[in-house]
Amino acid sequence: TPFPETYIRTFTDADGTTARIGFIGLTLPFNKAAFVTYTDVFTAAQKYYDQLKDSCDAVVAITHQAMDDDIKLARQIPGLALIIGGHEHERHYAKIGNVYITKADANAKSAYIIKLNLNKKDHALTIKADIIDVNEKVAIDAATDVVVQKWTGIANKSYASLGFDATKVCMQNGEPLDGREAYIRTQQTNFTRLIVSSIEKASPAADVAIVNSGSIRVDDILQMPVTQYDVIRSLPFGGSIMEVDMKGSLLIKI
């Protein structure tokens, strides 16, 4: 069954007053596959907003695209109530006209608590957005935890089928390993040095080891002990180490 192009949910408050909130979803066309049809994000957004706006009290866009594109979207469709965004790994907040844009940190390190207050008499909408850090002070939601445990079990079985034991400790002691995107994309860290050293050990005849920093996806600081799961979530794309002979002139260009 295909996903619906739009979604409307009805909310009811304590006195029985109802509000209909429409949702549209947008994502950037990344890693295009031949079996998927892609449309222009902004054209699609306008189309689905126009379909929803007269049948609900507010329209919210849930997006996964660059902040600049979320800003462009807010300017293109000023009637949107809110854009809940993703893609960047650091928190962002902006208000473009009357459109709020919120993005929390990656890896569930933080979350936005967003409250939409709608006056049904004059249709005035006010929004309050607060960001909280997700840590041990935040109580685990029982219903959410059921889903988390279900998918953790599915993931662990999948890892096991590939020969991994997600809970097995690879490194017991040592300093935390810095895999934060803001650092590994611009400089060396102890984690990137460890990865390069591992490749050099696997390919002892190589003079140079090169790693695409974009393949390191953890965007976090790994605390000891480090498990096989930490390795998987740090380098989830897999692939092989390739040894290539090349001239120094080509290496400089790379």
Identify the role of each PLM range.
Residues 1-139, 144, 186-198, 209, ...:
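Acidic, metal/ion-coordinating pockets
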Residues 115-254:
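Solvent-exposed loop/linker segments at secondary-structure transitions
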